[in-house]
Amino acid sequence: GFNLGNSVYVNGSSNNYVAWCFKAGGTKVANTQGLINTNVSANTTLGFSIVEYNGATNATNDQSNNSGNYWSVGHGLGATPDLVIVKKLNDVGSWYVGGAALSSSGTNGNHLVLNASSSMATQSNILWGGSQTFNNTTFGLGGWDVVNRNGDSYIAYCFTSKPGFSKVDSYAGNGTTSHLIQTGFEPAFLLIKGYTHGGGWVMLD
């Protein structure tokens, strides 16, 4: 289980709440596969990891790019992450979403924002970084302070699809009432976001 304080956002008197819980790998371990060292708790069987890291010491402004090499962060999944959600911990900032499912790369900077209803946006060469932005050991970062800045700390939640457990992908709507999206299993939790148009995130369970 987990313990709560008395914040009205999670534990207000007479209020009801829902929590979705994912088990990662237990005790976090050091990961040195990227240029930025991380602490990772990874469940490679279920395709989920939690990654803690500090911004690179030479990421001092949005245009920083490590002399064109950018930065990489080890995620511990052993497979390319389809979805990565990054949040700055020590200051205000939004939750930035990218990954293979959005065809995110350093060049296009494709991303969504978890706490916003906007469509997919781009931030070329400052959000994600490097030629192999998402691969089976690391994901790449630029110098934008929302994901990588000297003196700041971050957390990333990484997901890769696993048959029978999870599926992260995109699909095209057709406006009908009988549009079946194949996942290979019966989902218990569903998160949907229209990325070509504005609108909120839809969560079903």
PLM features: residue spans?
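Surface-exposed molecular-recognition determinants
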Residues: 1-205
